[in-house]
Design a protein with these regions (language model features):
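General structural signal for alpha-helix termini and helix-helix connectors
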Residues: 25-32, 50, 54-58, 74-81
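Short regulatory helix/loop adjacent to the ATP-binding pocket of P-loop NTPases
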Residues: 25, 229-242
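Conserved D-loop beta-strand region of ABC ATPase nucleotide-binding domains
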Residues: 225
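Conserved NTPase motor "head" modules and their coupling/switch loops across ABC/AAA+ ATPases, GTPases
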Residues: 58-193, 202-206, 210-221, 230-235, ...
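Extended, charged alpha-helical "arm/stalk" segments used for dimerization and assembly
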Residues: 1-51
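Walker B catalytic acidic pair
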Residues: 197-199
Protein backbone atom coordinates (compact mmCIF):
# COMPACT_ATOMS: atom_id res chain seq x y z
CA UNK A 1 0.00 0.00 0.00
CA UNK A 2 1.23 3.48 -0.91
CA UNK A 3 -0.75 6.29 0.70
CA UNK A 4 -0.87 9.97 -0.26
CA UNK A 5 -1.84 12.40 2.53
CA UNK A 6 -2.24 16.21 2.71
CA UNK A 7 0.76 16.53 5.03
CA UNK A 8 3.09 14.62 2.69
CA UNK A 9 4.92 17.85 1.86
CA UNK A 10 6.88 17.16 5.05
CA UNK A 11 8.97 14.68 3.04
CA UNK A 12 10.01 17.63 0.87
CA UNK A 13 10.52 20.40 3.41
CA UNK A 14 10.71 18.53 6.72
CA UNK A 15 13.67 17.96 9.00
CA UNK A 16 16.45 15.55 7.97
CA UNK A 17 15.22 12.82 10.32
CA UNK A 18 11.70 12.96 8.83
CA UNK A 19 13.00 12.56 5.28
CA UNK A 20 15.46 9.88 6.37
CA UNK A 21 12.64 7.90 8.01
CA UNK A 22 10.62 8.13 4.79
CA UNK A 23 13.41 6.52 2.77
CA UNK A 24 14.04 3.95 5.50
CA UNK A 25 10.40 2.87 5.28
CA UNK A 26 10.48 2.83 1.50
CA UNK A 27 13.64 0.73 1.22
CA UNK A 28 12.29 -1.61 3.89
CA UNK A 29 9.27 -2.32 1.68
CA UNK A 30 11.46 -3.78 -1.06
CA UNK A 31 14.50 -5.11 0.79
CA UNK A 32 14.12 -7.51 3.72
CA UNK A 33 17.85 -7.41 4.43
CA UNK A 34 17.64 -3.64 4.85
CA UNK A 35 15.00 -4.01 7.59
CA UNK A 36 17.24 -6.47 9.43
CA UNK A 37 20.27 -4.19 9.08
CA UNK A 38 18.33 -1.15 10.26
CA UNK A 39 16.93 -3.01 13.27
CA UNK A 40 20.39 -4.28 14.22
CA UNK A 41 21.94 -0.87 13.72
CA UNK A 42 19.44 0.83 16.03
CA UNK A 43 20.09 -1.72 18.78
CA UNK A 44 23.86 -1.36 18.40
CA UNK A 45 23.60 2.43 18.38
CA UNK A 46 21.48 2.40 21.54
CA UNK A 47 23.98 0.16 23.35
CA UNK A 48 26.98 2.16 22.15
CA UNK A 49 25.41 5.41 23.33
CA UNK A 50 24.62 3.89 26.72
CA UNK A 51 28.23 2.74 27.04
CA UNK A 52 29.54 6.19 26.05
CA UNK A 53 27.56 7.75 28.89
CA UNK A 54 28.85 5.14 31.36
CA UNK A 55 32.47 5.71 30.32
CA UNK A 56 32.28 9.29 31.56
CA UNK A 57 32.16 7.86 35.09
CA UNK A 58 33.93 4.53 34.55
CA UNK A 59 36.95 5.04 32.32
CA UNK A 60 38.11 1.46 32.92
CA UNK A 61 35.32 0.11 30.68
CA UNK A 62 36.45 2.06 27.62
CA UNK A 63 37.86 -1.09 25.95
CA UNK A 64 34.30 -2.39 25.60
CA UNK A 65 33.84 0.21 22.88
CA UNK A 66 36.04 -1.86 20.56
CA UNK A 67 33.40 -4.60 20.42
CA UNK A 68 30.54 -2.21 19.72
CA UNK A 69 32.58 -0.21 17.22
CA UNK A 70 33.28 -3.35 15.22
CA UNK A 71 29.58 -4.30 15.06
CA UNK A 72 28.60 -0.70 14.42
CA UNK A 73 31.04 -0.40 11.50
CA UNK A 74 29.78 -3.56 9.80
CA UNK A 75 26.16 -2.47 10.05
CA UNK A 76 26.71 1.19 9.18
CA UNK A 77 28.77 0.30 6.12
CA UNK A 78 26.08 -2.02 4.74
CA UNK A 79 23.31 0.55 5.34
CA UNK A 80 25.16 3.35 3.55
CA UNK A 81 25.89 1.15 0.54
CA UNK A 82 22.21 0.18 0.22
CA UNK A 83 20.99 3.75 0.66
CA UNK A 84 23.27 4.93 -2.14
CA UNK A 85 22.03 2.20 -4.45
CA UNK A 86 18.35 2.86 -3.79
CA UNK A 87 18.47 6.65 -4.04
CA UNK A 88 20.15 6.32 -7.43
CA UNK A 89 17.36 3.98 -8.56
CA UNK A 90 14.67 6.24 -7.05
CA UNK A 91 16.01 9.32 -8.86
CA UNK A 92 15.48 7.72 -12.27
CA UNK A 93 11.72 7.92 -11.63
CA UNK A 94 11.56 11.09 -9.56
CA UNK A 95 13.26 13.39 -12.08
CA UNK A 96 10.92 12.39 -14.89
CA UNK A 97 7.72 12.25 -12.86
CA UNK A 98 8.07 15.72 -11.40
CA UNK A 99 8.52 17.24 -14.85
CA UNK A 100 5.58 15.32 -16.26
CA UNK A 101 3.23 16.19 -13.40
CA UNK A 102 4.18 19.84 -13.02
CA UNK A 103 4.95 20.92 -16.56
CA UNK A 104 7.93 22.82 -15.11
CA UNK A 105 11.39 22.51 -16.61
CA UNK A 106 12.84 21.94 -13.16
CA UNK A 107 15.41 19.16 -13.10
CA UNK A 108 14.94 17.82 -9.57
CA UNK A 109 17.31 15.33 -8.05
CA UNK A 110 17.71 13.90 -4.54
CA UNK A 111 21.23 13.76 -3.18
CA UNK A 112 22.19 11.51 -0.31
CA UNK A 113 24.89 12.74 2.07
CA UNK A 114 26.36 10.12 4.38
CA UNK A 115 28.01 11.47 7.51
CA UNK A 116 30.67 8.79 7.04
CA UNK A 117 33.33 9.81 4.54
CA UNK A 118 33.71 6.26 3.24
CA UNK A 119 31.49 3.19 3.57
CA UNK A 120 34.44 0.79 3.72
CA UNK A 121 34.24 -1.07 7.06
CA UNK A 122 37.88 -0.39 7.97
CA UNK A 123 37.47 3.30 7.19
CA UNK A 124 34.32 3.46 9.33
CA UNK A 125 36.23 1.97 12.26
CA UNK A 126 38.99 4.55 11.78
CA UNK A 127 36.47 7.39 11.71
CA UNK A 128 34.86 6.13 14.91
CA UNK A 129 38.27 5.91 16.54
CA UNK A 130 39.03 9.53 15.65
CA UNK A 131 35.68 10.64 17.05
CA UNK A 132 35.89 8.51 20.19
CA UNK A 133 36.88 11.26 22.64
CA UNK A 134 34.22 13.61 21.29
CA UNK A 135 31.62 10.85 21.48
CA UNK A 136 32.55 10.12 25.10
CA UNK A 137 32.37 13.80 26.05
CA UNK A 138 28.97 14.18 24.38
CA UNK A 139 27.66 10.81 25.48
CA UNK A 140 26.41 10.00 22.00
CA UNK A 141 27.56 8.70 18.61
CA UNK A 142 28.22 11.73 16.42
CA UNK A 143 28.49 10.08 13.01
CA UNK A 144 26.79 7.28 11.15
CA UNK A 145 23.60 6.45 9.22
CA UNK A 146 21.43 8.10 11.91
CA UNK A 147 23.04 11.42 10.93
CA UNK A 148 22.69 11.06 7.16
CA UNK A 149 20.83 13.66 5.11
CA UNK A 150 18.78 13.61 1.90
CA UNK A 151 18.50 16.93 0.05
CA UNK A 152 16.36 17.77 -3.01
CA UNK A 153 18.01 20.10 -5.51
CA UNK A 154 16.50 21.92 -8.46
CA UNK A 155 18.02 23.79 -11.36
CA UNK A 156 21.49 25.28 -10.89
CA UNK A 157 22.01 22.99 -7.88
CA UNK A 158 19.71 25.13 -5.69
CA UNK A 159 17.97 23.55 -2.71
CA UNK A 160 14.40 22.97 -3.87
CA UNK A 161 12.69 23.83 -0.58
CA UNK A 162 14.43 27.22 -0.52
CA UNK A 163 12.41 28.48 -3.49
CA UNK A 164 9.52 26.04 -4.04
CA UNK A 165 5.97 27.31 -3.67
CA UNK A 166 3.32 25.37 -1.76
CA UNK A 167 2.04 23.96 -5.05
CA UNK A 168 5.50 22.90 -6.18
CA UNK A 169 6.11 21.14 -2.87
CA UNK A 170 2.78 19.35 -3.19
CA UNK A 171 3.65 18.16 -6.70
CA UNK A 172 7.12 17.09 -5.61
CA UNK A 173 5.67 15.04 -2.74
CA UNK A 174 3.22 13.37 -5.14
CA UNK A 175 6.09 12.69 -7.55
CA UNK A 176 7.98 11.03 -4.69
CA UNK A 177 5.04 8.80 -3.82
CA UNK A 178 4.52 7.87 -7.48
CA UNK A 179 8.23 7.08 -7.67
CA UNK A 180 7.72 4.83 -4.67
CA UNK A 181 4.95 2.99 -6.53
CA UNK A 182 7.25 2.55 -9.55
CA UNK A 183 10.20 1.37 -7.46
CA UNK A 184 8.10 -1.22 -5.65
CA UNK A 185 6.78 -2.58 -8.93
CA UNK A 186 10.20 -2.59 -10.57
CA UNK A 187 11.78 -4.57 -7.73
CA UNK A 188 8.95 -6.76 -6.42
CA UNK A 189 6.89 -7.01 -9.62
CA UNK A 190 3.73 -6.37 -7.62
CA UNK A 191 1.13 -3.65 -8.08
CA UNK A 192 0.54 -1.33 -5.15
CA UNK A 193 -2.83 -0.39 -3.75
CA UNK A 194 -2.76 3.40 -3.94
CA UNK A 195 -4.65 5.56 -1.43
CA UNK A 196 -5.13 9.30 -2.02
CA UNK A 197 -6.60 11.12 0.95
CA UNK A 198 -7.84 14.54 -0.22
CA UNK A 199 -4.59 15.51 -1.97
CA UNK A 200 -6.05 16.43 -5.36
CA UNK A 201 -8.13 19.44 -4.33
CA UNK A 202 -5.04 21.67 -4.04
CA UNK A 203 -4.06 21.04 -7.67
CA UNK A 204 -5.35 22.79 -10.76
CA UNK A 205 -7.24 20.80 -13.39
CA UNK A 206 -4.24 20.08 -15.62
CA UNK A 207 -2.03 18.78 -12.84
CA UNK A 208 -4.86 16.83 -11.22
CA UNK A 209 -5.43 15.15 -14.55
CA UNK A 210 -1.70 14.41 -14.88
CA UNK A 211 -1.64 12.66 -11.50
CA UNK A 212 -4.74 10.57 -12.21
CA UNK A 213 -3.52 9.66 -15.68
CA UNK A 214 -0.26 8.34 -14.25
CA UNK A 215 -2.17 6.12 -11.85
CA UNK A 216 -4.54 4.91 -14.57
CA UNK A 217 -1.65 4.15 -16.92
CA UNK A 218 -0.01 2.09 -14.18
CA UNK A 219 -3.17 -0.02 -13.86
CA UNK A 220 -3.10 0.17 -10.06
CA UNK A 221 -6.04 -0.22 -7.72
CA UNK A 222 -6.67 3.36 -6.58
CA UNK A 223 -8.83 4.58 -3.71
CA UNK A 224 -9.44 8.33 -3.57
CA UNK A 225 -11.16 10.41 -0.90
CA UNK A 226 -12.19 13.91 -1.93
CA UNK A 227 -14.69 16.58 -0.95
CA UNK A 228 -16.07 16.87 -4.47
CA UNK A 229 -16.50 14.40 -7.32
CA UNK A 230 -15.19 17.16 -9.59
CA UNK A 231 -11.70 16.21 -8.40
CA UNK A 232 -11.97 12.95 -10.34
CA UNK A 233 -14.20 13.94 -13.25
CA UNK A 234 -11.31 13.17 -15.63
CA UNK A 235 -11.69 9.45 -14.92
CA UNK A 236 -14.22 7.51 -17.00
CA UNK A 237 -14.46 4.23 -15.13
CA UNK A 238 -14.63 4.35 -11.37
CA UNK A 239 -16.93 3.37 -8.52
CA UNK A 240 -18.34 6.34 -6.62
CA UNK A 241 -19.15 5.96 -2.92
CA UNK A 242 -20.63 8.85 -0.98
CA UNK A 243 -20.33 9.25 2.79
CA UNK A 244 -23.03 11.33 4.48
CA UNK A 245 -23.40 11.38 8.27
CA UNK A 246 -21.19 8.29 8.54
CA UNK A 247 -23.35 6.36 6.08
CA UNK A 248 -21.93 5.01 2.82
CA UNK A 249 -24.01 4.89 -0.35
CA UNK A 250 -23.30 4.44 -4.06
Amino acid sequence: VVAFFPDDTVIISGTPDVIRRYFDRLISKVDKEYIELLTSFRKILKNRNRLLKDILYKRDIIKQLDIWDSMYSDCASALVIKRKQYIEHFNTYFKTLYKELSGFNDDLTIKYYASLHNENVTDVKNELSKKRNIDIQMGTTTLGPHRDVYVIYGNENTMFKSYASTGQRRLASIAMKLSEVSLIYDIKKSKSIVLLDDVLSELDDDRRKNVLQKLIDGNHQVIITCASSNDVNFVDNYKHLQVVHNRVSE
